């Protein structure tokens, strides 16, 4: 039984978001729909989710003492990490003291770096993955590349959005790739993973919900990546029945091994009927923003329903849909959006995130579209995104 209090009253149910970007903003909105009190935390002020939260705090979430202080002050009933760069040791301590970390502290810790989740998937669960080696020095990095072979990919074990990642074709690239990986790690220089290149037809994100009434799957989400970030996503991605069954089996194994209730973004490579595990995020996934228009319950609504202990029941997918990012390049602390009226229409929506500033290239919004088929939906979403003019 789920008992929900009313925000700003003595019996309020309080949710603290650790990470207040565009994904956290949608989670906050879903919490608001249920009258939940929302506290948004991030490393910079005026982050998107702070606009729709009851209160907000600006801290370095990798600082365990600062994290413990704000959690002790606010006394949330649910702590919901929305990014990886968090002092997960502190979350495990707090969970041990009786606090509720979503989906659980172990999941946030294992998925914070690529080594934890890769060893769980490949070595404990025996799931198919790319070949890989880990290295923590330049010498061991050279050994790892020799073991994996060319071509290969090097990534910091702790990074996101393609930071520090290189595609290596020859030995001449090794020194530069090592240096770039050391600069791109989320917590500074350190350990890297060297991965063999997987031959695949396409990548999917299988949004998987672990809830009180079992494990549920959204229709597979296809996506296109560029420079480490997604540019378009679409649902449903067409694939064979056997490949879909195998993808669901892998996702089920992973989320049950991680534990807890919530939505997980399970990333997989698909080649014919074969499926290979890539990564998993124990939270809503950026490629899953397409579900804001493609499903009766978005990935954000599903996440909230699951971690509150409510049953999911079933997920209704409306039909072909797509998302395309609005990714301008400029420098401004006073961003404006022009021509939005020309972007929206029947079956086409726009979401603007409300990020306070931009310095270079930054994702500031997303266009959402439906279509007769996936190809048409992608074209409509891209056209809508291109019509929005960002100024500053």
UniProtKB/Swiss-Prot annotation:
Pathway, per record: Purine metabolism; IMP biosynthesis via de novo pathway; N(2)-formyl-N(1)-(5-phospho-D-ribosyl)glycinamide from N(1)-(5-phospho-D-ribosyl)glycinamide (formate route): step 1/1
E.C. number(s) listed in UniProt: 6.3.1.21
Keywords, sorted A to Z: ATP-binding, Ligase, Magnesium, Metal-binding, Nucleotide-binding, Purine biosynthesis
SUPFAM superfamilies: Glutathione synthetase ATP-binding domain-like, PreATP-grasp domain, Rudiment single hybrid motif
Reaction it catalyzes: N(1)-(5-phospho-beta-D-ribosyl)glycinamide + formate + ATP = N(2)-formyl-N(1)-(5-phospho-beta-D-ribosyl)glycinamide + ADP + phosphate + H(+)
Entry binding sites for Mg(2+): 267, 279
MF annotations from Gene Ontology: ATP binding; magnesium ion binding; phosphoribosylglycinamide formyltransferase 2 activity; phosphoribosylglycinamide formyltransferase activity
Gene3D superfamilies according to UniProt: 3.40.50.20, ATP-grasp fold, A domain, ATP-grasp fold, B domain
Residues covered by the ATP-grasp domain: 119-308
Pfam families in the record: ATP-grasp, PurT_C, RS_preATP-grasp-like
EC top class, as a word: ligase
SUBUNIT field: Homodimer.
Annotated family: Belongs to the PurK/PurT family.
PANTHER family documented for this protein: FORMATE-DEPENDENT PHOSPHORIBOSYLGLYCINAMIDE FORMYLTRANSFERASE (PTHR43055:SF1)
Protein's recorded name: Formate-dependent phosphoribosylglycinamide formyltransferase
Organism: Salmonella newport (strain SL254)
């Amino acid at each position: 039984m789920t008992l929900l209090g009313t925000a700003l009253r003595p019996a309020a149910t309080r949710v603290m978001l650790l990470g207040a970007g565009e994904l956290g903003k949608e989670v906050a909105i879903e919490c608001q729909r249920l009258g939940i009190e929302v506290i948004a935390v991030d490393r910079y002020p005026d982050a998107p989710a702070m606009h729709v939260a009851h209160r907000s705090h600006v801290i370095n979430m990798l600082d365990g003492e600062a994290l413990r202080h704000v959690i002790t002050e606010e006394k949330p009933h649910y702590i919901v990490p929305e990014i990886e760069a968090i002092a997960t040791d502190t979350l495990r301590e707090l969970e041990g003291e009786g606090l509720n970390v979503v989906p659980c502290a172990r999941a946030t810790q294992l998925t914070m770096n690529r080594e934890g989740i890769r060893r769980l998937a490949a070595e404990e669960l025996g799931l198919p993955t790319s070949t890989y080696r880990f290295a923590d020095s330049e010498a061991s990095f050279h050994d790892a590349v020799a073991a994996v072979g060319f071509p290969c990919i090097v990534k910091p074990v702790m990074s996101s959005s393609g930071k520090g990642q290189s595609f290596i074709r020859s030995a001449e690239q090794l020194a530069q790739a090592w240096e770039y990986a050391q600069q791109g790690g989320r917590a500074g220089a350190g350990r890297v993973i060297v991965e063999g290149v997987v031959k695949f037809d396409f990548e999917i994100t299988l949004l998987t919900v672990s809830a009180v009434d079992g494990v549920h799957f959204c229709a597979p989400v296809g996506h296109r990546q560029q420079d480490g970030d997604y540019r378009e996503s679409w649902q449903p991605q067409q694939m064979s029945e056997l490949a879909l069954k195998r993808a669901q089996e892998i996702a089920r194994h992973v989320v049950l091994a991680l534990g807890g209730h919530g939505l997980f973004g399970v990333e997989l490579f698909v080649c014919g009927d074969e499926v290979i595990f890539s990564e998993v995020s124990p939270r809503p996934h950026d490629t899953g923003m397409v579900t804001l228009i493609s499903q009766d319950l978005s990935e954000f609504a599903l996440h909230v329903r699951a971690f509150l202990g409510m049953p999911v029941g079933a997920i209704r997918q409306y039909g072909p849909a797509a998302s395309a990012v609005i990714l301008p390049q400029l420098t401004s602390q006073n961003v404006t959006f022009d021509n939005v009226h020309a972007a929206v229409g029947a079956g086409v929506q726009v979401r603007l995130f409300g990020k306070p500033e931009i310095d270079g290239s930054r994702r500031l919004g997303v266009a959402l579209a439906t279509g007769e088929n996936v190809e048409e939906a992608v074209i409509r979403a891209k056209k809508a995104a291109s019509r929005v003019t960002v100024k500053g």
